[in-house]
Regions:
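Nucleotide-activated donor-binding/catalytic signature segment of Leloir-type glycosyltransferases, i.e.
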Residues: 233-253
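Membrane-proximal helix-turn-helix segments that form the acceptor-binding/catalytic region
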Residues: 103, 129-146
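Conserved acidic donor-binding segment of nucleotide-sugar-dependent glycosyltransferases
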Residues: 309-316, 324-330
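Carbohydrate-associated surface elements
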Residues: 153, 173
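Short hydrophobic beta-strand element within catalytic cores of glycosyltransferases
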Residues: 290-294
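Conserved donor-binding/catalytic core segment of Leloir-type glycosyltransferases
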Residues: 4, 148, 174, 182-210, ...
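Aromatic "clamp/platform" in nucleotide-sugar-dependent glycosyltransferases that forms part
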Residues: 273
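Glycosyltransferase donor-sugar binding loop
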Residues: 38-44, 193, 220-234, 251-252
Length: 375
């Protein structure tokens, strides 16, 4: 079975690039000929992985909306595929892939990547998105063989927008492996990992450290990531305003630098209002590190499996979660870490997720029964 994905494996794209890469890798390990087409790389671009077949379009995006007139032709020039799979929405390459699949007479899937959450639609280019939804996207979604989402909340948002196509709920995968770096100091360190973006509410952690005062004086907040320069400047100004000497900006890290930085953290926090999954949670739980997330994120398992804190999206609750993380004993955090690692091994491994995705493709190709995760 030949599958062509359209998306990106560029590391700066964050979680979507990582989960797309791991999905491709897992599918190929299970005998599926999965490939990807994406825009050409810039000199500074780093890939999440380069051991899966990649094709590059002949042109780069011409506008902020990603308009690339030759993208559809580039897809069709690659030959025949059984199924086409687009990663993300509001993107020209997704429209092009859906159109190419229909021209080839083949089924296609679309993975929205959390971009159909009402908060995401409202926070940027809302007018364009609503116009695009009515003009083109909803039709593409409803003509898809299936829409793939990562949690039930995302499925609900799709239905509320008028998506009537079958929807498959399959979470993102995480690579199960041993990580050589271990925590080397006794500092109770709260980490943030991800894009530096206003949507991520990183200031919620800075506000928590300010509110805790002496309770956090011996702790540290480590912010790992890059992105919106203006927002980062605002965060640095906030730190300076509060006189916090225990907040550190590490910038974008990858490879061993990232592994070492994460290993130094006692707890990771994802204080954003919403995520369709939040690959950061996968990345830290597999390393045996507990996590804080808000209830706008589909991570009730942090609470039910005792591997972190799942709290309402309010500053008071985020501050209280940070307080509890700072006050927890080493033994408590270690137990939470073991629970998180076990959860990842049981439900989120690359092999497990690739098996589900393969069964979804086989159903679409009329070669297998409808999986139970398709609604």
């Amino acid at each position: 079975m030949r599958i062509l994905h359209s998306g990106t494996l560029v590391a700066s794209a964050g979680g979507p690039a990582m989960s797309t890469y791991l999905t491709l890798k897992g599918l190929r390990e299970q005998g599926v000929d999965a490939e990807i087409i994406m825009f050409p790389l810039n000199n500074e671009d780093k890939l999440r992985g380069d051991d899966v077949p990649m094709h590059f379009a002949t042109s780069t995006p011409k506008t902020p909306l990603g308009f690339a007139p030759t993208y559809k032709r580039d897809i069709l020039s690659l030959g025949d595929y059984d199924i086409y799979h687009a990663q993300g929405v509001w993107l020209w390459n997704t429209y092009a892939l859906a159109s190419a699949a229909r021209k080839a007479g083949k089924p296609y899937l679309i993975t929205p990547r959390g971009m159909l959450y009402p908060q995401d639609i409202a926070k940027s280019n809302a007018f364009f998105k609503k116009l695009s939804l009515r003009w083109r996207l909803l039709d593409d979604l409803n003509r898809a063989a299936c829409v793939h989402v990562t949690c039930k909340e995302e499925m609900m948002h799709c239905r509320n927008l008028g998506v009537t196509a079958p929807i498959a709920v399959i979470p993102n995968p995480v690579e199960i492996k041993d990580y050589p770096y271990k925590k080397q100091d006794g500092v109770r360190r709260i980490g943030y990992l991800g894009r530096v973006s206003r949507r991520k509410n990183i200031e919620g952690l800075i506000e928590a450290f300010h509110a805790l005062g002496d309770e956090a004086k011996d702790a540290e907040l480590l912010i790992i990531g890059s992105g919106d320069k203006e927002y980062e400047s605002y965060l640095r100004h906030l730190v300076e305003k509060y006189g916090l000497s225990n907040v550190r900006f590490a910038g974008f890290l990858s490879g061993e630098e990232k592994d070492e930085a994460l290993a130094s953290c006692s707890v990771l926090a994802m204080p954003s209002e919403f995520e369709n999954l939040g690959n950061v949670v996968l990345e830290v739980l597999v390393r045996g590190i507990p996590c804080i997330a808000t209830t706008g994120n589909p991570w009730e398992e942090l609470q039910s499996r005792n591997c972190g804190w799942w709290v309402p999206y309010t500053q008071l609750d985020i501050t209280n979660a940070v307080r509890q993380a700072l006050q927890a004993s080493d033994a408590t955090l270690a137990e939470m870490g073991r629970n998180g690692r076990q959860l990842m091994e049981q439900r989120y491994s690359v092999t497990s997720i690739a098996h589900q995705m393969k069964s979804l493709y086989e159903w679409i190709a009329a070669a297998a029964p409808k999986p139970e995760f398709v609604r």
